[in-house]
């Protein structure tokens, strides 16, 4: 199956038909919810009961990730390059707003009349203090984020960042678009805030390019890879912060990795001693080196009981 990014611009791929399909698929909704919950976990936000966070959702699409933010008590603003996806998101927000106001389905939704333009946020009135509604904006993230400095407490992005690695016009240079996006993100985040951007790199070089562009504008952080040995469950999360010396957390492990660790503990229990290699590259050093490569998004072979073991001397 070809990648959507290779078919053209995101605004063309996510048309009205694809937007409805995207929002009605139970599998897609479940995956989006799981990824969003993981991104919020990596943000390490204070409890919303104490103080709700103001969060920017870049590439918000049909508002599936925004719905999770609302359920956790946070306030959010979403931007996306696809008008059709925003129409679906606005319909859901409008229905929730009418339901909170007690109007239900009696009043007709005016979602089809909404216009989404750059620098124009569709503010939803909120008469119910217990309900939160997302604000939507039609905008291309590759041109930078048009918000005031230090506006947001945090930022999330689900399955959108990799689109900046592809060029659909002569003036769309991936490195420049990535740098422009990260530079503006650095400005709109409040100091002490974080950003967690989940993306699907086609190659290891794309993951390195994204990380380098983020570091160039001043961000600290790294790439967290969940389930690195799974073809379907593998997920990349770029965690960005202002904290110098920040070390990205270790990604979630799959069954295979857990099994290897259990075997390692059993070997320790048997008090098997591994002699240090002459060149200084012990098994611990090799495992640490492989883990570092995984965080950079590179393809690394799975750890086994033979990792770091000396080969037999043969003629």
Locations of regions flagged by a protein language model:
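C-terminal lobe and adjacent flexible extensions of AdoMet/dcAdoMet transferase-like proteins
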Residues: 234-315
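Conserved S-adenosyl-L-methionine
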Residues: 219-230
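Conserved class I S-adenosyl-L-methionine
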Residues: 1-50
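Class I SAM-dependent methyltransferase SAM/SAH-binding core
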Residues: 54-144
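Conserved beta-strand signature within the Rossmann-like core of class I S-adenosyl-L-methionine
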Residues: 192-199
